[in-house]
Design a protein with these regions (language model features):
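Generic secondary-structure signature for well-ordered alpha-helical cores
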Residues: 193, 221-231, 235-242, 251-259
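Short catalytic-site patches enriched in acidic/histidine residues
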Residues: 104-114, 191, 200-206, 210, ...
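A composition/biophysics-driven feature that prefers long, compositionally simple stretches
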Residues: 39-229, 287
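Extreme N-terminal basic, low-complexity initiation segments
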Residues: 2-10
């Protein structure tokens, strides 16, 4: 960290991250990240020459490694996308932009982790492409049935530019209206410029409600995993045990069982709701460190999350 005087007695911070060339690849100056493409006269190399302006892409494809084993067979995803294309044809849509976790995962197999960043899946008559942030590198492509485009952070709204690169401009496009905020809906109109838009969420919901044989088989295994968690909780219940201890016993047992049954899956979000005594008065009261007492009412819920199911 280098403190740089402004000449008025106030110090500002400048923080440089070294690049492969040995110079700062990014500079934080006055609270703003700037890189070589946004150089200002005061951002100099060590030899006092200006940093060069570097072209930065809006998007790229990072197909790192090989495709992973998806939650379902290729044929399952092909059937789902074919069903969506039937809906598109029925309503005269050229493309559909999916943005919710459940729809992106349902049609592509990729269960994203947003952390404040937009993710999506664009389906056209010929393509099924997930759109992901650079921070996730090659994982979205490996976990997607279909192609993947990575958008960069060099400019605001590169997500929507990546979306538009697949949908094309001036097309009839379906979106999940119940998932788009007013801000994102405005960005969709600005960057995709649809000649006609349609809320596709009711139709996709109906499609997802009809479970395939493969989905039913997975859900049955999930119920069996929940039983494993329930038995572990029963064994952990005793006077003096904390709610958190009991909940962790059930969660750990379920995660181990999921890993045994689904060795190629990604493991996330499995959890237990365990409440005791006064904490049972609300359905969504969080787990606490309250110690169990004789005569307590106990409430437990096991949530084994297997690829979003």
């Amino acid at each position: 960290m280098v403190l740089v005087g402004r000449g008025d007695g106030v110090a500002t911070g400048k923080f440089g991250f070294p690049s492969l060339a040995g110079e700062p690849a990014f500079v934080l100056h006055a609270g703003i990240f700037r890189g070589p493409a946004m150089c200002r006269p005061h951002l100099m190399r060590s030899d006092m020459t200006p940093n060069p302006i570097i072209e930065r892409p809006e998007q790229y494809r990072f197909h790192n490694g090989t495709k992973a084993v998806w939650p379902f067979a290729v044929e399952e995803y092909e059937d789902r996308v074919a069903g969506l294309r039937d809906i598109m044809e029925m309503h005269g849509l050229d493309a559909v932009v999916l943005t919710s976790m459940h729809n992106v995962a349902y049609y592509s197999g990729f269960l994203y982790c947003g952390f404040g960043r937009p993710y999506g899946c664009v389906v056209t008559a010929t393509e099924c492409v997930t759109i992901s942030a650079g921070i996730d590198a090659g994982q979205p492509w490996r976990r997607s049935h279909g192609d993947n485009i990575t958008y960069t952070d060099w400019a605001r709204d590169n997500f929507w530019r990546a979306v538009a690169s697949v949908t094309g401009l001036g097309k009839a496009v379906g979106v999940e209206a119940d998932h788009l905020t007013m801000e994102r809906a405005e960005k969709f109109n600005t960057f995709v410029k649809p000649k006609r838009g349609m809320d596709i969420s009711p139709a996709t919901m109906v499609q997802r409600m009809t479970k395939s044989a493969a989905e039913i088989a997975l859900i049955k295994q999930g119920a069996q995993v929940a039983d494993v968690g329930g038995y572990a909780i029963r064994d952990a219940v005793r006077v003096g045990a904390r709610e958190i201890d009991v909940a962790m016993a059930g969660r750990d047992a379920m995660e181990m069982e999921i890993a045994k049954r689904f060795p190629d899956a990604e493991y996330r979000d499995t959890w237990v709701w365990f409440q005791s005594g006064i904490n049972t008065d609300g359905a969504h009261n969080p787990v606490t460190s309250r110690k169990l007492k004789q005569g307590d009412i106990l409430s437990l819920n096991c949530f084994p999350m297997i690829s979003g199911y």
